Amino acid sequence: MAKGIIHYEVGEQVDLFLLIKSATKGIASNGKPFLTLILQDKSGDIEAKLWDVSPDDEERYVPECIVKVAGDIHNYRGKLQLRIRSIRPAHPGDAVRIDDFLEKAPLGREEMKAKVMEYIFAMENPNIQRITRYLLKKYEKAFFEYPAATKNHHEFISGLAYHVVSMLELAKALIHLYPSLNKDLLYAGVILHDLGKVIELSGPVSAAYTLEGNLLGHISIMVSEISKAAEQLGIQGEEVVILQHLVLAHHGKAEWGSPKPPLVKEAEVLHYIDNLDAKITMIDRALEKVKPGEFTERVFALDNRSFYKPAFLSVSKPKNPGSKE
């Protein structure tokens, strides 16, 4: 099996097919245009610069384009980059498909769907359950295909659903520890909090922000969707407002993009488990790229910190002296 792009080290030569995840135009200090490419395979992605680009290059090297790249890995300001020596678009004779380069959630869609439905069926409040089921059914296909973000966390196929399933497991554990939490509100909040991303983002591959995503954002989108769902189902009452509040408050603070701070206990918990799952995922993905005893590259979304991968954790545990093995 070929080595994934994130497992290459500084100085290693690269000669392989990759998928363009994003392409951003810039102007160099010499006044010439260049492209910042994010290139990916199933292991993850890496940044590369394509210098002195022509108008044809700008049209040729776009998101969802498979390219054959040769070059080497170097360290730029604490982050690995692919220095391009040659690049060309793939052609039919190369026998490569976009699906060959897409990272996917560790769980299959049907397995995740079964898990999400299990939590919906556990809800006892009929209004909360009906609104949640209605919205999930309305956006089911996209929910189980889309990433949770364009970068930073769960930015892979079915990442949104995988993020939700992980959060539901966290919510279940916390409800066991703190029985005063209302499971209906917390489970519904987990399922709905990021559902607006199926409108905010363009699709499961090379996701970008849509017009609605740029002008409204997933939080405002889902608050509106909850209101429309309640009206369609003939549901009135406090549950509707609190579900909207859970979505509005899940980023925690205004400076983190939250229109309201959490003012309901379940909203506070939702914020913490959302934050925890996202951050653990970011750290894990950074640690996957380094060997034991090394620091990761800086993680911008985590205050630009580098994380250490303890060397002792990779050492096999000594056998128990009393063991017969």
Swiss-Prot record:
PANTHER family xrefs: 3'-5' EXORIBONUCLEASE YHAM (PTHR37294:SF1)
EC number(s) stated in the UniProt entry for this protein: 3.1.-.-
The keyword Ribosomal protein belongs to this UniProt entry's keyword annotation: no
Disulfide bonds: none
Domain of life: Bacteria
Domain HD, first and last residues per copy: 163-279
GO molecular-function term, one example from the UniProt record: 3'-5'-RNA exonuclease activity
UniProt KW Cell membrane keyword: no
Function text: Shows a 3'-5' exoribonuclease activity.
Name of the protein described by the UniProt record: 3'-5' exoribonuclease YhaM
DNA-binding region(s) from the entry: 14-90
Family as reported in the entry's similarity comment: Belongs to the YhaM family.
A matching Pfam family: tRNA_anti-codon
Top EC class, one word: hydrolase
